[in-house]
Amino acid sequence: MPRYGFHLSIAGKKGVAGAVEEATALGLTAFQIFAKSPRSWRPRALSPAEVEAFRALREASGGLPAVIHASYLVNLGAEGELWEKSVASLADDLEKAALLGVEYVVVHPGSGRPERVKEGALKALRLAGVRSRPVLLVENTAGGGEKVGARFEELAWLVADTPLQVCLDTCHAYAAGYDVAEDPLGVLDALDRAVGLERVPVVHLNDSVGGLGSRVDHHAHLLQGKIGEGLKRVFLDPRLKDRVFILETPRGPEEDAWNLRVLRAWLEEA
């Protein structure tokens, strides 16, 4: 059965531990967080008490799968100081994931040269001393400009002969020209041929405000965007039955209730 959840906040006194509490309260079976502010280079220290509380709460919840999303400032395709800062920031997220016992770290490749993206991702793994866990996932992008990773073939090159794996974002794929609305299984087939679905442990299950091939990275709530029911076929595809599905849409009691109602209705239909 797929595991599912939201991107949760770590703001407040409880920090990362508060995210586990919220996930449990909402009945989620997975969750995603930032390890620090997504719009600051400043690292965020984790106290031993915060780490202990996070680990204990996850264990008590049955070990909810967790994902850390790297900072939005990271651009592994850049040059010079920006590239160095991006690699250091990603390494910091990987170190925190290892400390917390988090399984996955997701990063946007950025803009520039694919060779720099691959080099930067591998350097971050080395700096963090990561061997097998956490797994670093490169997320597909909506494309436009010099953004790296909009095409599945480019993702395949980025992860080839490395420990890197892939995070599929359905909104980004649709915006990049993959018709998740009308041919979701064909899109998964294309990803399988290029990368191998066994190397896609996490899916960002987002609907899309923008149209097919629009290059617009604007997420919508389930069934409230241009993809619609195509997302159900992705969510329930047997090839993805044990994957982690994360929704990255604006949070609120009504919005959460809607998205959970849709996901749980889909599971009942399966």
Swiss-Prot record:
EC number, UniProt record: 3.1.21.2
Domain of life: Bacteria
Reaction(s) catalysed by this chain's protein: Endonucleolytic cleavage to 5'-phosphooligonucleotide end-products
Cofactor binding description: Binds 3 Zn(2+) ions.
Enzyme class: hydrolase
UniProt-annotated binding residues for Zn(2+) 2: E139, D169, H204, E248
Keyword Hydrolase found: yes
Cofactor(s) this protein cannot do without: Zn(2+)
BP term (GO), one: base-excision repair
Keywords: DNA damage, DNA repair, Endonuclease, Hydrolase, Metal-binding, Nuclease, Zinc
Positions with a binding annotation for Zn(2+) 3: H172, D217, H219
MF (Gene Ontology): deoxyribonuclease IV (phage-T4-induced) activity; DNA binding; DNA-(apurinic or apyrimidinic site) endonuclease activity; phosphoric diester hydrolase activity; zinc ion binding
InterPro entries to which the protein is assigned, alphabetical: AP_endonuc_2, AP_endonuc_F2_Zn_BS, Xyl_isomerase-like_sf, Xyl_isomerase-like_TIM-brl
Residues the entry annotates as binding Zn(2+) 1: H69, H108, E139
Homology family: Belongs to the AP endonuclease 2 family.
HAMAP family linked: Nfo
Stated role: Endonuclease IV plays a role in DNA repair. It cleaves phosphodiester bonds at apurinic or apyrimidinic (AP) sites, generating a 3'-hydroxyl group and a 5'-terminal sugar phosphate. In addition, possesses a 3'-5' exonuclease activity.
Entry-linked PANTHER family: APURINIC-APYRIMIDINIC ENDONUCLEASE, ENDONUCLEASE IV ENDODEOXYRIBONUCLEASE IV
Name used for this protein in its record: Endonuclease 4
